[in-house]
Amino acid sequence: MRISLFFFVSYYIVIIGDRMNIGVDIDDTITNTYETLLTIISMKYGLNHKKLISMNLGYDEIEKSLDNYDLYKKDLFSVMAKSVTLKENVVEILNKLRDEGNKIILITARNYEEYGDPYKVSYEYLVGNNIPFDKLFVDVYDKGSLCKKENIDIFIDDNVRNCNSVNNVGIRTVQFDTSFTPKVKDVEHVSSWDEFYELVYK
């Protein structure tokens, strides 16, 4: 009985000591934003969805290639933000990390131009889809500075600029790899939330 109790207490102390502030991006990290947005765009513009997906265009390339994109942008993102699907096992892994005493701090570049009210849109979606979080920051251009201010221990994002921004301030950075985003050098890489969980405590 004493051995079991000692093991439990020791394990508890380890978990408490390992508490971290985990910074997490939303689009294409928690959600399948790219795929969902292309589905909406293909319907709006009458384009071949499979062909559009296979081209692996970046967001900037998509914007430049579509007529009147600026006129439709807010509507496109508004529909996407409400209907976007989640990455596999993201809810389970984030809940597990939070249950282990870590703080989940969501940091997104979602802005007022594309989303109207990015905080409201994001908050309602996250709560409605049972995504656990302790803080939510929107319209963040310089994620490196914010991560430093919030004492982030480890950060995950798909975007090249964001990963470089955070990595450059000395914070452990993980890129969530996608087919349409170049890989960042000098950071860790995962392609699933299960992989990220395995990486967190290494």
Across the structure, where does each feature detected by a protein language model lie?
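Short, basic/glycine-rich phosphate-binding loops at helix/coil junctions
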Residues: 62-77, 102-104
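Asp-based, Mg2+/Mn2+-dependent phosphohydrolase catalytic module
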Residues: 148-149, 160-202
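Acidic di-acidic motifs
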Residues: 27, 157-158
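Short, Lys/Arg-enriched N-terminal segments with co-localized hydrophobic residues
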Residues: 1-19
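Substrate-recognition element of Asp-dependent hydrolases with the DxDx(T/V) motif
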Residues: 81, 90-122
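Substrate-recognition "cap/lid" segment bordering the active-site pocket of phosphatases
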Residues: 110-154, 160-164
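Active-site neighborhood of HAD-like aspartate-dependent phosphohydrolases
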Residues: 17-69
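A structural signal for isolated positions on well-ordered beta-strands in alpha/beta enzyme cores
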Residues: 103-105, 154, 172-174
